């Protein structure tokens, strides 16, 4: 009996460590600054100058799916997305989880940028990233906080939510995210520990499924893309020839 109680305590402690690690990853991901996101979107627009907003968003989504699927198939493999930093010392959850969350954050904030929604405040970025990752449950928390049931709820996060309400909303989003994310990832983690080959297939396929869920949530949050680019968003040329060097990765 005493042993069972001890095991239960260890499980609780481990859960607490995992939660702290996830929160640390979330904080790092939501610190992606507005200028960095704008630079990434501008890079993509220069690489594909004829893309409409809808086409560019689809391109952003495809790059995201490709990156997270690759990271699931080969944990620790390189799947480069401009704008992402390296997250180290995340043994409790793993660098792959950090990469997935940061990639989700970059996708979410980039899509917001294409929609003309600036996300400069750290708390707003965190709320938006969490709500999109959660999908329907995130939407419900946002709608409850702002008192609106708008179908495309992404812009609601950018509305004037009082500081205390924003803090409480983020706490609710974090709690729900930790519960939901750990439940999904635990099954994938087991699959990746299977013999080589089988684990890679499960890891890649599992990440692809979760990634497609993030894409779907993003579409529901922001709604249809703008039909055209605002005239004010002029894209500078590529004086250093960087795009020519990287076109083979598109």
Feature names for model-found ranges:
Residues 1-78, 102-250:
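Terminal, membrane-proximal amphipathic helices
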Residues 81-92, 197-198:
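Transmembrane helix boundary and interhelical junction motifs in multipass membrane proteins
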Residues 89-95, 201-206:
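Hydrophobic core segments of alpha-helical transmembrane domains in multi-pass membrane proteins
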Residues 90-96, 100-106:
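Glycine-rich active-site/cofactor-binding loop and its immediate structural neighborhood
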């Amino acid at each position: 009996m005493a042993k069972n109680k001890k095991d239960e305590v260890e499980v609780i402690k481990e859960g607490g460590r995992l939660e702290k690690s996830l929160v640390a990853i979330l904080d790092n991901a939501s610190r992606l600054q507005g200028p960095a996101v704008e630079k990434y979107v501008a890079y993509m627009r220069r690489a594909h100058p004829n893309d409409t907003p809808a086409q560019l968003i689809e391109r952003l989504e495809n790059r995201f799916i490709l990156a997270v699927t690759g990271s699931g198939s080969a944990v620790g493999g390189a799947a480069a997305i401009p704008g992402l930093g390296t997250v180290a010392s995340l043994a409790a959850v793993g660098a792959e989880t950090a990469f997935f969350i940061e990639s989700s954050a970059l996708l979410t904030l980039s899509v917001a940028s294409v929609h003309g929604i600036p996300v400069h405040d750290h708390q707003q970025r965190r709320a938006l990233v969490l709500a999109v990752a959660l999908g329907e449950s995130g939407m419900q928390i946002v709608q409850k906080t702002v008192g609106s049931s708008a179908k495309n709820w992404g812009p609601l996060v950018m509305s004037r939510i009082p500081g205390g309400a924003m803090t409480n909303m983020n706490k609710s989003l974090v709690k729900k995210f930790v519960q939901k994310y750990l439940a999904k990832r635990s099954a994938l983690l087991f699959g990746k520990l299977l013999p080589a080959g089988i684990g890679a297939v499960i890891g890649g396929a599992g990440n692809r499924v979760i990634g497609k869920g993030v894409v779907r949530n993003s579409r529901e949050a922001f709604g249809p893309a703008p039909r055209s680019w605002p005239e004010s968003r002029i894209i500078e040329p590529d004086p250093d020839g960087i795009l020519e060097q990287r076109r083979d990765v598109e």
